[in-house]
């Protein structure tokens, strides 16, 4: 059922590059101390806090930004390559592009599971560096999946209602 909804999913992820740039700007402003989003970026706080000091190898401003750029670059590059292969498949007589995209997506899933967990530690859990959870990344991932399926369904229902997805039926949307 998903090929009919590929363009919907690709459209939804179209925000990734501008959204990623926005996130990087916020994180750079945090590192420059132009906001106080992450308390562990304040040297005075770190000096008097044993827990934050113990995490200073991981909670390092430069390493933090490098990780953020790594996560977002990987996600944006995957989105770009996957979309390019998807469009190429539309104009192809064989399924080589589909097979490439399938293999790429399987590899990306592993990359995403790891980087999404680390992203949740970096951007959410480190707001309060005294709190930690080994399961938090999985909770965030589960929330992302539910949000993604809901968003795909709502946008697909809307697009079908205005005539853009005539081949989509209740079987595709599990209604």
Question: For the regions a protein language model found, what residue spans apply to each?
Answer:
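Transmembrane-helix bundle segments that line or gate the permeation/cavity pathway
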Residues: 1-91, 108
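Long, contiguous internal "core" modules enriched in hydrophobic/ aromatic residues
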Residues: 55-175
